[in-house]
Structure formats: C-alpha cells, structure tokens
Amino acid sequence: MAPCVAGWLGGFLLVPALGMIPPPEKVRMNSVNFKNILQWEVPAFPKTNLTFTAQYESYRSFQDHCKRTASTQCDFSHLSKYGDYTVRVRAELADEHSEWVNVTFCPVEDTIIGPPEMQIESLAESLHLRFSAPQIENEPETWTLKNIYDSWAYRVQYWKNGTNEKFQVVSPYDSEVLRNLEPWTTYCIQVQGFLLDQNRTGEWSEPICERTGNDEITPSWIVAIILIVSVLVVFLFLLGCFVVLWLIYKKTKHTFRSGTSLPQHLKEFLGHPHHSTFLLFSFPPPEEAEVFDKLSIISEESEGSKQSPEDNCASEPPSDPGPRELESKDEAPSPPHDDPKLLTSTSEV
C-alpha cells in the first residue's frame, strides 16, 4: 500500500516539473429550450494565460467550434435537436495542451424545458388562463417546444394566497379555466411544461396572484357610484346646452335691436313683388338700338324765295343754312308757338 501512495504522490509532483497542463474542470452541458452551452472551469495552474478549444463529433470526426478562446463556455445551439453528440474541451498553453474532457449529449432528451408564459383573466368566481409554450433557440418565432414534443401539456398549480394547500390540474390545451373558486379571494398560480409520454416536467413559472369576482350580485357601492356619475354627466350636458342656447338668443336679440331699420318706402317696395318686375322691364334691352329725332328749321325767307322763280334767277345761290340746322340725339329746342316756322320731324332707327 505504501509503494502505491508513494508512486501516486511522485506522479503528482512531476506534473508541474514536466510542464504538463491539467484539463478543464467541471465540464457540463447546460441546455435550456435547445440553447446548448458547454461550460467548464479553469483548472488550478500557476500560469493564468490558458486558452481552450472545444469540438463536437460530426460524421465520426471532430470539428473545431471554439478554438483557442479565453472564455469558459462554448455555444453548440446549432446542433440538430434529434442527434446524439459527443463534445469535448481541453486547455492549451502555447504548443502544449491538456487531455480532452468528453461529454455526451442528446438535445431532444437532455435539454431543460423552460417555464411557459401565462396570462390570467378574472371573471366572476373563476380564473381564465392562457398559456404560451417556450420558444426554441435559433428557430422562427412561431416555433415553440410544443412543435417538438407531441405529448406536450401544461401542469397548473394554484393555491389560495396565504395558505399552503395547493391544487394541480393538467391541460393539453393553450387555455384552462379554474372554476368554483371562492368569490373576492386572491389565488396564486404557476405553470410548467409537462411531457405526458415521458412523465417529464419542466421548470415552474413565477407565481402570479389574481383576485376573483362575484357573478351573482354587484356590490352596492359600485352601483351607487355608477348611478351618481351617470346623473352628473347628464346634468352637466343639459346645463351646457341651455347656456349655449341662451347666449345665442341674447346675441341675436342684441344684434337686431341695435341695427338701423330700412326706410319705409323701401319696405313698401319690397312688400310688393310686382314692382320689382316692372322696374326690371322698364330698362331697354342692351341689344336694342338708340332712337333719335332729326329736326329741320326752315325760315320764311327761304319759303318766299321758292314762291318767286324769277327772283331766283337774279339772286345769288342760297347760302349754307349753317348753324340754323341742328341735329339732336336726345333732345332739340322746340320753336315758340308764335313763330311761323314750319317744323318737320322724321324718325330714324
């Protein structure tokens, strides 16, 4: 027994002397909802500038995934959910390295089922629950764990707030109703994913507390408040309408009272519509031509010369009547009644 202990102790002391690097410690795969993270811890070693390389087995050969990283974890979420994998990691320093540390892993069996999301609606003496399964890493938003596991269900646990007695119910649907609860009582609820065929459970969600109502009667103080508010709103509305109409009436009355009234003759004219029609037709149409009279004035001397033809031969030719012949467009002077002049009038259009 003593030789074995001495050999083991000698080998342990020779490790730092020969420069051998110890492997990573506490290597494990931490997978939640198919987010696969390989984690480890830095080994006890005098030098602190160690790096690490992590690999996974693909088609019977290992592929580097995280090479010479100073981190103590490596993300393997890209792996298929239905395969069996061997992943490994080692510590490195310059050209030296430690032994590999292997971990076997099957995502669909080993991943941890995270807590679902839950919404609660209080209705009378019951609580209506709605669930959402956890989403899958590196998949579209519509993909959840329910799309991966055919036997997916929800396990609901609820209890009255302040008590230790808990009740459970399992539902394969995305909703559940907790009935026959005590009215006006606060209940706390939490939910977890559950695989019926594997009897495998996930993590519990955080408790959510909600108060129930009462379907039979509504509290009298609520009815009183609603009634008072309704009456007050109607009263204010009617009062506002009355004030607006009163202001309009006062403004209209003041306007007509202070304004000047129409003249009496204009009121009489407007009171007989046929006067307006007569006034309209009293003006000539715009296309009608103007009418004027041409007046000719003939003196007695001119008339006498016409009666003595012999005198006309000896006399000089008659002179231009000049200004004694006038044309007037609108009006012409009329001769006096005692003037023996002959007036002739012709109309031209």
Curated annotation (Swiss-Prot):
One of its GO terms (molecular function) is interleukin-10 receptor activity. The keyword Glycoprotein applies. It is found in: Membrane. It is a single-pass type I membrane protein. Glycans are attached at residues 49, 102, 161, 199. The modification Phosphoserine is found at residue 299. CDD domains: FN3. Gene3D superfamilies: Immunoglobulins. Disulfide bonds join 66-74, 188-209. Its main location: membrane. One of its GO terms (biological process) is defense response to virus. Residues 242-349 are cytoplasmic. InterPro entries: FN3_dom, FN3_sf, Ig-like_fold, Interferon/interleukin_rcp_dom, Type-II_Cytokine-TF_Rcpt. Residues 20-220 are extracellular. Residues 322-341 have a biased composition (Basic and acidic residues). It comes from the Eukaryota. Residues 300-349 are annotated as: Disordered. The chain crosses the membrane at residues 221-241. Residues 1-19 form the signal peptide. Keywords: Antiviral defense, Disulfide bond, Glycoprotein, Membrane, Phosphoprotein, Receptor, Repeat, Signal, Transmembrane, Transmembrane helix. Residues 23-111, 112-215 form the Fibronectin type-III domain. Heterodimer with IFNLR1. Shared cell surface receptor required for the activation of five class 2 cytokines: IL10, IL22, IL26, IL28, and IFNL1. The IFNLR1/IL10RB dimer is a receptor for the cytokine ligands IFNL2 and IFNL3 and mediates their antiviral activity. The ligand/receptor complex stimulate the activation of the JAK/STAT signaling pathway leading to the expression of IFN-stimulated genes (ISG), which contribute to the antiviral state. This is Interleukin-10 receptor subunit beta. It comes from Mus musculus.
